């Protein structure tokens, strides 16, 4: 290694630092998805079954979302009903 190479500003990042950065992005993404409760998919499935007793709908016609605002949690339920 040359003495001038040591002081160069345009060094390429090492593969280890690139791998570390990518892993941090993946971990942050996984943590973001864990914020939804485990019961949400089963709740959506059961809601579809109950609504199907009265109205003909598909699995994609019911959307369930849970939002947290401070100490309050809001369960949002959107149902697309067919035209009569």
From Swiss-Prot:
Record's keyword terms, sorted: Cell cycle, Cell division
Role description: Prevents the cell division inhibition by proteins MinC and MinD at internal division sites while permitting inhibition at polar sites. This ensures cell division at the proper site by restricting the formation of a division septum at the midpoint of the long axis of the cell.
Signal peptide stretch: none
GO biological process, any: regulation of division septum assembly
Transmembrane residue ranges: none
Species per Swiss-Prot/TrEMBL record: Pseudomonas fluorescens (strain Pf0-1)
InterPro entries cross-referenced by the UniProt entry: MinE, MinE_sf
Domain of life: Bacteria
Keyword NAD: no
Origin organism lineage: Bacteria, Pseudomonadati, Pseudomonadota, Gammaproteobacteria, Pseudomonadales
Name recorded for this polypeptide: Cell division topological specificity factor
Gene coding for it: minE
Pfam families (UniProt xref): MinE (PF03776)
Family: Belongs to the MinE family.
